[in-house]
């Protein structure tokens, strides 16, 4: 696991091991406190925020005892305030689909690109190598170095300073869009398809693929390159309840789902008992849109008005045959500008829907809030499940509201084939301590470990959780993980 940078990493491991061996509990407390700032640390300690500190201490005591279950994942060096990036790198290392996506891109490029991959796809190459390293479970402590990824990322995200404290969710989005930029530039259509058949529009959409199987495969390959595993699609629909029409339906890709917690009155605290399901429901709930003009409702009202005032049959027919599109000229051509009308007749609702379940689902709990004077952080626990069923939050057809859907799904047994559709397993939790814009990030990672005997029999996997604060790694229990005040949650589709 340390072969690529053998001597360098080994040296770091030695230094860290020595430091931990000599450390008593105060040294480990103080090194942690140094990261947070003393004030934040005292606050966190008073409020019991360091459930893991005891584990960290225990861990340093357990150094010499390398028993049968003392396997570990590598930590990551902090190269100066980059804990926000380290947690993202650890999180991505836990996402099997993300690691295999990077490997697939490199593999795919091997056939079509001339020259060294390290030169052509420097960020993909560096990230893939680091994530493989972080994904390797070992029996000894090791610490990996994120420097190469940081250097290559800086070339793309020039305005994103990686050495001053940043938001972890923002770092993830920068990393994804930088990768996208690199991968798209290096994309070459496969030899079997004709380059002239493939046109790219400015917004990175492939237009008019060549016909037949090759064209379809090329399109799939292009989408896979472009979107990666964070490939969810969010639909946004506007409906008019008054005339039961759909005004608009738009789709967009999403990398993360930003969910706001439920708040107590006043909006300074997260409501006790708030769950991730509550937040999802709130996010996907219909909301009333004010001051929006429904053309179909207007046409209905205009038809009644013309009949009442005894207008000519030809005028009524013109209105009736109009599709009620927002571009029509009924208002002016029929002199209806003065018709008494208020848009409050229409009841317009907006709703977001998850139109495609992503392979990897990243949920961003929006804890940053504002009042009149300043930005503040919403702290408090939001319960989240180990297994999430996202299909419960997706209306089967537009207009069916989510509560009805939940009732429906519990009433009727789903067919066997679609049983796992929309089912997700928790793989990583990112937690933030301290104030927004400063403080410290830590991460919980789940790692699947196969013991040798099990591998021979039926490959039963053993899921272990680790708490990681930069270079410090320790094993924790599932309940430690579920107790976290999550900022980011990564779920993998089952
Ligand atoms: Zn309407
Ligand atoms: Zn019209």
Curated annotation (Swiss-Prot):
Residue ranges crossing the lipid bilayer per the database entry: 30-50
Active site: 83, 440
GO terms assigned for molecular function: cysteine-type deubiquitinase activity
Pfam families: UCH
Entry membrane topology: Single-pass membrane protein
EC numbers on record: 3.4.19.12
Keywords: Hydrolase, Membrane, Protease, Thiol protease, Transmembrane, Transmembrane helix, Ubl conjugation pathway
PROSITE patterns (UniProt xref): USP_1 (PS00972), USP_3 (PS50235)
One GO process term, biological-process aspect: protein deubiquitination
Domain named USP: residues: 74-494
GO annotation, cellular component aspect: membrane
Enzymatic reactions: Thiol-dependent hydrolysis of ester, thioester, amide, peptide and isopeptide bonds formed by the C-terminal Gly of ubiquitin (a 76-residue protein attached to proteins as an intracellular targeting signal)
Matches recorded under SUPFAM superfamilies: Cysteine proteinases (SSF54001)
Localisation: Membrane
Function as written in the Swiss-Prot or TrEMBL entry: Recognizes and hydrolyzes the peptide bond at the C-terminal Gly of ubiquitin. Involved in the processing of poly-ubiquitin precursors as well as that of ubiquitinated proteins.
Family assignment from sequence similarity: Belongs to the peptidase C19 family.
Protein's name according to its UniProt entry: Ubiquitin carboxyl-terminal hydrolase 27
Taxonomic source organism: Arabidopsis thaliana (Mouse-ear cress)
């Amino acid at each position: 696991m340390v072969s690529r940078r053998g001597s360098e990493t080994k040296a770091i491991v030695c230094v860290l091991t020595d430091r931990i061996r000599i450390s008593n509990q105060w040294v480990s407390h103080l090194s942690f406190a140094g990261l947070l700032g003393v004030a934040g640390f005292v606050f966190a300690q008073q409020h019991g925020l360091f459930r893991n500190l005891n584990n960290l201490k225990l861990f340093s005591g357990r150094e010499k005892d390398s028993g049968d279950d003392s396997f570990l994942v590598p930590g990551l060096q902090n190269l100066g305030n980059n804990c926000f990036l380290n947690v993202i790198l650890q999180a991505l290392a836990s996402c099997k689909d993300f690691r295999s996506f990077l490997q697939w891109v490199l593999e795919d490029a091997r056939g079509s690109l001339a020259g060294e991959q390290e030169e052509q796809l420097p960020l993909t190459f560096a990230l893939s190598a680091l994530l493989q390293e972080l994904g390797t479970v070992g029996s000894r402590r090791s610490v990996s170095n994120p420097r190469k990824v940081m250097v290559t990322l800086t070339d793309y995200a020039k305005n994103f300073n990686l050495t001053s404290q940043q938001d972890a969710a923002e770092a993830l989005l920068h990393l994804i869009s930088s990768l996208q930029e690199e991968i798209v530039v290096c994309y070459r259509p496969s030899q079997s398809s004709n380059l002239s058949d493939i046109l790219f529009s400015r917004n990175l959409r492939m237009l008019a693929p060549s016909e037949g199987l090759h064209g379809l495969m090329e399109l799939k390959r292009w989408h896979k390159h472009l979107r990666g595993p964070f490939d969810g699609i969010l639909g946004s629909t506007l409906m008019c309840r008054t005339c039961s029409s759909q005004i608009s339906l738009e789709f967009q890709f999403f990398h993360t789902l930003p969910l706001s917690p439920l708040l107590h009155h006043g909006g300074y605290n997260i409501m006790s008992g708030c769950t991730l399901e509550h937040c999802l429901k709130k996010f996907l709930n219909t909301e009333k849109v004010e001051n929006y003009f429904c053309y179909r409702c207007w046409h209905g009202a205009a038809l009644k008005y013309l009949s009442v005032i005894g207008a000519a049959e030809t005028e009524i027919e013109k209105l009736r045959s109009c599709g009620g599109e927002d571009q029509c000229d009924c208002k002016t051509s029929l002199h209806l500008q003065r018709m008494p009308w208020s848009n409050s007749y229409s009841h317009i609702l907006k709703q977001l829907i998850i139109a495609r379940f992503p392979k990897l689902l990243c949920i961003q709990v929006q804890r940053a809030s504002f009042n009149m004077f300043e930005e503040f952080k919403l702290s408090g626990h939001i319960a989240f499940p180990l297994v999430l069923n996202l299909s419960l939050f997706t209306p089967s057809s537009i207009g069916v509201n989510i509560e009805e859907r939940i009732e429906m799904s519990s009433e009727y047994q789903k067919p066997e084939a679609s049983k796992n559709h929309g089912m997700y397993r928790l793989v990583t939790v990112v937690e933030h301590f301290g104030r927004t814009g400063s403080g410290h990030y830590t991460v919980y990672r789940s790692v699947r470990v196969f013991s040798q005997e099990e591998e021979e029999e039926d490959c039963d996997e053993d899921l272990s959780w680790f708490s990681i604060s930069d270079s410090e790694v320790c094993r924790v229990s599932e309940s430690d993980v579920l107790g976290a005040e999550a900022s980011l949650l990564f779920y993998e589709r089952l």
